[in-house]
Amino acid sequence: MAAAALVAAALVIAPALAPFPTAAPIPAASAACPGAEVAFARGREEPPGVGLVGGAFVNSLRSKVPSMSIGSYGVNYPADVSAAKGANDMSAHIQSMAASCPNTRLVLGGYSLGAAAADLVVAVTQPAFGLTDPLPPGMDQHIAAVALFGNGTRRVLGPVPDFSPAFAGKTIDQCAAGD
């Protein structure tokens, strides 16, 4: 994955990390919450964590928004042949973050098989395709952006906004030439 694509993705997503307008007091638990968090599903066969592409993306995003604390979460799944386990972990993490850190701006991302996991999270609204705990209605309000790299699922489903309009305008889908 070209460094230029990662930098371009960070430039597109950085404005989406502007804080939520809020009239309600921030819960006490939010004091330890990051301003934004990237939940990233690594590519197939990569070791646990956010992976090479995810790490480069998070670092690029941090350099574009240095005034904001940006956490990262490596989706916990085997990264072998199925995206469903990654989608379930990502969905559970998003729901947990929304409950414990309601003002944290969430960025979902994935590379290769991890992009397919993120696709499941944003596309599937009922248990299906191995996703057992889809995001409840309204959860998209906590998601500032979706960044997909090497997303093979796009060839089958099309772009994310086509099947999940709530993410139109806040999704990027980068592929290398020939992907």
Descriptions of predicted regions:
Residues 88-172:
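Serine-dependent carboxylesterase/thioesterase catalytic core
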Residues 30-105, 174-179:
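Active-site catalytic motif of lipid deacylating hydrolases and related acyltransferases
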Residues 7, 12, 38, 50-53, ...:
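Extended aliphatic helical segments
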Residues 9, 22, 71, 167-170:
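Generic structural motif recognizing short loop/turn segments at the entrances and edges of beta-strands
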Residues 1-25:
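Secretory targeting and sorting signals
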Residues 18, 23-24, 41, 68, ...:
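Small-side-chain structural scaffolding
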Residues 15, 35, 43, 49-55, ...:
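Residue-identity detector for glycine
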